[in-house]
Amino acid sequence: MQKRELYEIADGKLVRKHRFCPRCGPGVFLAEHADRFTCGRCGYTEFKKVKKAKS
């Protein structure tokens, strides 16, 4: 994925599509997987919360 694909312009402002890594800081994005967010540089991982269906 290229850096330009991680941003979009909305109402004349630059908006990030992905989150930055809290360990590495600005400029290092977290990759979005089906069940987690992962940093490719330091290995930081955040798991997504699973919504349980009411029965």
From Swiss-Prot:
GO terms for biological process: translation. Keywords: Metal-binding, Ribonucleoprotein, Ribosomal protein, Zinc, Zinc-finger. Its cofactor is Zn(2+). One of its GO terms (molecular function) is structural constituent of ribosome. One of its GO terms (cellular component) is ribonucleoprotein complex. Zn(2+) binds at C21, C24, C39, C42. Pfam families: Ribosomal_S27. A zinc finger (C4-type) spans 21-42. Binds 1 zinc ion per subunit. The keyword Ribosomal protein applies. Belongs to the eukaryotic ribosomal protein eS31 family. HAMAP family: Ribosomal_eS31. Part of the 30S ribosomal subunit. This is Small ribosomal subunit protein eS31. It comes from Thermoplasma volcanium (strain ATCC 51530 / DSM 4299 / JCM 9571 / NBRC 15438 / GSS1). The gene is rps27ae.
